[in-house]
């Protein structure tokens, strides 16, 4: 199985459905023998440019391990889901488990660090 980094942007009006979407994608990956090594919900953030007349989106990052068929199925789910504004799949050489820069910045703000 291969490792992938997946980032997808959800329409801000659908933010309350994000946990259910994550569980559906998690179920698909795990039922086909894959694993999620890192899952981060970056929350609602400003976009650099308008996408479908929307200036904010809900960002989700997942590092997954799955086979090619599962990846294609996941790509199709994103493609046909109107709530997903953009998605990006990057092939990785190994599993990434440490927190991303975005998550560590969010944690620093919570603690009051600069």
Swiss-Prot record:
Listed Gene3D superfamilies = 3.30.70.60
Q: Which UniProt keywords apply?
A: Ribonucleoprotein, Ribosomal protein, RNA-binding, rRNA-binding
Checking CDD domains in the record gives:
bS6
Q: Which InterPro entries match?
A: Ribosomal_bS6, Ribosomal_bS6_CS, Ribosomal_bS6_sf, Ribosomal_S6_plastid/chlpt, Transl_elong_EF1B/ribsomal_bS6
Q: Which BP terms in the Gene Ontology apply to this protein?
A: translation
GO MF, one term, reads: structural constituent of ribosome
A Pfam family found in this protein is Ribosomal_S6
Entry GO CC: cytosolic small ribosomal subunit
Q: Does the keyword Ribonucleoprotein apply?
A: yes
Q: Does the keyword Transferase apply?
A: no
Q: Tell me the superkingdom of the source.
A: Bacteria
Similarity-based family? Belongs to the bacterial ribosomal protein bS6 family.
State its role.
Binds together with bS18 to 16S ribosomal RNA.
Q: What is this protein called?
A: Small ribosomal subunit protein bS6
Please give the organism: Hydrogenovibrio crunogenus (strain DSM 25203 / XCL-2) (Thiomicrospira crunogena)
């Amino acid at each position: 199985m291969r490792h992938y980094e997946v980032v997808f942007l959800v329409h801000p009006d659908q933010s309350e459905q994000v946990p259910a979407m994550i569980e559906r994608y998690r179920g698909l990956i795990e039922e086909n023998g894959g694993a999620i090594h890192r899952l981060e919900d970056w929350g609602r953030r400003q976009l650099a440019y308008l996408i479908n007349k929307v200036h904010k989106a809900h960002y989700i990052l997942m590092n997954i391990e799955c086979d090619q068929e599962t990846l294609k199925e996941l790509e199709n789910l994103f493609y046909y889901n109107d709530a997903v504004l953009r998605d990006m799949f990057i092939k990785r050489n190994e599993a990434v488990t440490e927190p991303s820069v975005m998550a560590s910045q969010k944690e620093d703000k919570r603690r009051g660090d600069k």
